Structures are given as structure tokens and as C-alpha cells.
């Protein structure tokens, strides 16, 4: 029995040693992590938050962006509103906008902040209206259909976010933006995460979801996806629904951010596996294929294994 205990302790020590070069590489770097509402419904939240708190303690600067789609939809239905989406974007009338604010800034955000505090971290909840940190313009009609109070990010004010990070805090960001007309706008959380990653010059953008990653026509997981292939899969109806803004957001970021990934939050400690080990759990997004074996820009490891 004592031998088994010692073997387990050695195994844990080896895991820490394996993580050391990755911790050294990312220490002081900013990461933007988006946790989707569907992933939160699956019960993986504490595992994700434990990972985020650990990253903060080892000198990495995580920014958490959260969704809340399933809960917003549930509240819409309580008020007799049928949720409607166009290319993964929620059609948002005035009443739905109020419900979104209530859910994101009044419930989901504070709950995540409380959980982080219980895990030993320090977090502050905010939305794009605060500061304001996100100035947005109304998003153009999609396929001839108006989206209502749906915003497109025009400016990011990084100063309050940098201040929180410099204080050792974890910003927990709700995807609400402020329009130039003074109105609040619902902004897709994947889009918010990408724009924050670009503005903050993050080393990585990680989009956590409740599926393995992006799949091809055969249903096989794509460990790497470039812009050309993504465009083909979207136009061909292979990438659909809520995966469209995820892929679009990730590809928007990769020209500036070190790397962008869509990973499976259902895998325990998926963030640590992605960042601090050689194991991969999703799809890496790249600008274009180089014709060589894809390499993780920040960690220096083969795509699909980092």
C-alpha cells in the first residue's frame, strides 16, 4: 500500500515537472478564455474555474468571457418569446435585451465570480457597458433579416482590464456592449472573446464548448482548420449554428493572437491539458496551412497535441 502511495506521489511530481516549461513560457502572458453557456450547463464549470485559478497563481493572466445562451432562451420562453437564431446569432428585441442583461450581468457573471473566490482566486465581474470597455455598432441584417439589439464590436478599451490583471484579479466578462446611441447591445460571446484577445494582444484565445471541436463531412474531428477550409465547410452546411461564430471568431483572432483553439470543456481540466501538457482536446485554428506539420505558435508543439 505504501508503495502505491509513493508511486502516485511520484506520478504527480512528474506531471508538475512536465508542466514547468509551459508555465515558464506563458508566465506573464494574457490568455482569453471563453466559456459557453452550453458548456456551463454540462457541469464542467468547477473544473474550468480550478484551471483558471491555477493559471493565475503561476503568473499567467487569464481573462474569462462567459456566455449564457441556454438560460437566456429559458427566460425568453417564460415570457412567451420564441428564441430565434440566424447563423448562430440570437435575434434580440428590446425585451430579450433586458433578459440578456439580467441573466449575464445579474446571474451568470456573479455566480462565476463567487465560484472563483471559493476556489481561492480573486475575480471581478464586468460587461462592455462598464468603462465602457466595449463600444459597438448595430450588426447589419443577416440574409435580409434584422437582428435587433445585436452589436458588432467597434472599439475595445483595454485600460480597466489591464488594471485588473495587474492587480492579480481575474476579469469575468459578460458579452454586453454599449452602443454609440447609449443603448445596450447583445454581442456574441465568441466574438467578444476574439476582439478582447486581439486588443489585449493575448498569447492564446481558447473557446470552450460542449463538443469535441470542429468536424468534417464524415464527422471526424479536425485537429487543424484554416480560413479556406472553414469557408468551404460553412458554405457547404457542414459547420452550422453556434459553431459558425466560434470558427469565425477564432479565425478573426489568429492573425494577431499566438493561437486560437476550440476545445471540449467536458474533458476534465481541458485547459491545463491544452496549455501545460502535450495532450490536445480540440481544433486549432490557423490562418493558412503551411504545407508542413502544424505547430502551436505559443507552445511550440504539434497542433492537435497542444
Each language-model region and where it sits:
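C-terminal catalytic "cap/lid" subdomain
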Residues: 2-306
Amino acid at each position: 500500500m505504501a508503495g502505491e502511495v509513493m508511486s502516485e506521489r511520484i506520478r504527480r511530481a512528474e506531471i508538475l515537472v512536465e508542466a514547468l516549461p509551459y508555465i515558464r513560457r506563458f508566465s506573464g502572458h494574457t490568455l482569453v478564455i471563453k466559456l459557453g453557456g452550453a458548456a456551463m450547463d454540462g457541469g464542467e464549470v468547477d473544473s474550468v474555474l480550478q484551471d483558471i485559478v491555477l493559471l493565475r497563481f503561476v503568473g499567467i493572466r487569464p481573462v474569462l468571457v462567459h456566455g449564457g445562451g441556454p438560460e437566456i432562451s429559458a427566460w425568453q420562453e417564460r415570457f412567451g418569446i420564441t428564441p430565434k437564431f440566424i447563423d448562430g446569432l440570437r435575434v434580440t428585441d428590446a425585451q430579450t435585451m433586458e433578459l440578456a442583461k439580467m441573466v449575464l450581468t445579474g446571474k451568470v457573471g456573479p455566480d462565476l465570480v463567487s465560484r472563483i473566490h471559493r476556489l481561492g482566486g480573486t475575480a471581478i465581474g464586468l460587461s462592455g457597458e462598464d468603462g465602457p470597455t466595449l463600444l459597438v455598432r448595430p450588426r447589419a441584417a443577416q440574409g435580409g433579416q434584422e437582428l435587433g439589439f445585436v452589436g458588432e464590436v467597434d472599439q475595445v478599451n483595454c485600460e480597466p482590464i489591464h488594471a485588473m490583471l495587474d492587480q492579480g484579479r481575474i476579469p469575468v466578462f459578460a458579452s454586453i456592449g454599449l452602443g454609440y446611441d447609449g443603448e445596450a447591445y447583445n454581442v456574441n460571446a465568441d466574438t467578444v472573446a476574439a476582439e478582447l484577445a486581439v486588443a489585449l494582444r493575448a498569447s492564446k484565445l481558447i473557446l470552450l464548448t460542449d463538443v469535441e471541436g470542429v468536424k468534417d463531412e464524415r464527422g471526424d474531428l479536425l485537429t487543424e482548420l484554416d480560413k479556406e477550409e472553414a469557408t468551404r465547410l460553412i458554405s457547404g452546411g457542414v459547420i452550422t449554428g453556434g459553431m459558425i461564430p466560434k470558427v469565425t471568431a477564432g479565425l478573426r483572432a489568429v492573425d494577431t493572437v499566438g493561437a486560437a483553439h476550440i476545445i471540449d470543456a467536458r474533458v476534465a481540466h481541458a485547459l491545463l491539458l491544452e496549455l501545460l501538457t502535450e495532450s490536445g482536446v480540440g481544433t486549432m485554428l490557423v490562418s493558412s496551412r503551411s504545407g508542413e506539420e502544424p505547430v502551436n505558435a505559443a507552445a511550440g508543439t504539434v497542433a492537435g497535441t497542444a
